[in-house]
Regions:
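Active-site recognition of the HExxH zinc-binding catalytic motif
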Residues: 1, 221
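M16 family metallopeptidases and their MPP-like homologs
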Residues: 5-51, 81-107, 129-135, 186-197, ...
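An aromatic/glycine/proline-enriched structural segment found at the starts
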Residues: 94, 102, 127, 131-198, ...
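Conserved, carboxylate-rich catalytic/transport cores that coordinate ions
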Residues: 121
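Zinc-dependent metallopeptidase catalytic helix centered on the HExxH motif
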Residues: 205-206
């Protein structure tokens, strides 16, 4: 910015004993600092400056674009699990943006230029499209004046209409198989689109969290006890579900076979346990146990 030369933001945070980073997910981008309470005003001032006065040149974009390309090569192109995950999401979601990787496809990254970046920045980086999160030994009485001082004076940006994409119903099964010479341990999973806190039949989100814990949430889950302990055909087995997604979430099952165990046999065993839950339901003891484990994990 006009107030901070390249690198001065990070240097200021480090000089004051703090740490900083940023990340992008499917639903949001976050910038954060961990720093002493008496330096809170400093980082709020720096972030407000970054939100409104960012300067980017083509000369700066080129090396950073190369960094992102290299990150993609390292984390995706050279990682069979990540390759499969990309292909899986592209097949699982017919229309929702989750079918596209967060980091982007290689040709998309290569096409980014300073005009693309500044256009996105000017449209999205504004107080009316941001959430300020502060945690630690600070009160609202201390925080609110700082928020008003640094963010309250920033003009609202363009009003962004939230046009949420609708995912159409699936009409056919989709099965993916990825074979790679670097894979030393095969794995299997099955995934279903499911409601989240924000999408679809949201009233089911809490129940699905408990169900995931019962079926495959750890050593006491049905899948682990049956496939890993009793039948000894899997090295691991479980279920997963995340209700936080803005769009449709995924409820899934996974298993890693023991050496010599056929993948088809493993799939039948997993789905036999799932079918049992669909047919007979779960017990009150399983529900209370799952809730207690989830509460303990949240502390």
């Amino acid at each position: 910015t006009d107030n901070q030369k390249p690198g001065e933001f990070s240097a200021a945070v480090a000089r004051n004993g703090g740490q900083e980073n940023a990340f992008t997910s499917y639903d949001h981008t976050a910038y954060y600092q961990t720093i002493a309470k008496d330096r809170l005003e400093m980082v709020m001032r720096l972030e407000a400056d970054r939100m409104t006065h960012l300067l980017i040149t083509a000369k700066q974009v080129a090396p950073e674009r190369d960094v992102v390309l290299e990150e993609r090569r390292m984390r995706v192109d050279n990682n069979p699990s990540s390759q499969l995950r990309e292909q899986l999401n592209a097949a699982l979601y017919l229309n929702y943006p989750y079918r596209r990787p967060v980091i982007g496809w290689e040709h998309e990254i290569k096409a980014l230029d300073v005009d693309h970046i500044l256009s996105f920045y000017k449209r999205h980086y504004a107080p009316n499209n941001a959430v300020l999160i502060v945690e630690g030994d600070v009160t609202m009485a201390e925080l609110k004046p700082l928020a008003e001082k640094y963010y309250g004076i920033i003009p609202r940006g363009p009003e962004i209409v939230r046009e949420r994409t609708i995912e159409p119903p699936a009409r056919a099964d989709r099965r993916l198989i990825l074979e790679h010479e670097r894979v030393t341990q095969p794995g299997w999973s099955r995934r279903y689109l499911a409601p989240s806190y924000h999408y679809g039949d949201t009233q089911h989100a809490y129940a699905l969290q408990v169900l995931s814990e019962i079926i495959g949430g750890g050593p006491s889950s049905r899948l682990h006890k049956k496939l890993v302990v009793d039948d000894a055909i899997a090295l691991s087995a479980g279920a997963f579900y995340d209700a936080d997604d803005i769009g449709p979430s995924v409820f899934g099952f996974y298993a890693t076979p023991k050496p010599g165990v056929d993948m088809a046999k493993l799939e039948v065993a997993v789905m036999h346990e799932v079918d049992g839950v669909l047919r007979d339901g779960v017990t009150d003891q399983e529900v209370s146990g799952a809730i207690n484990r989830m509460r303990n994990a949240a502390v």
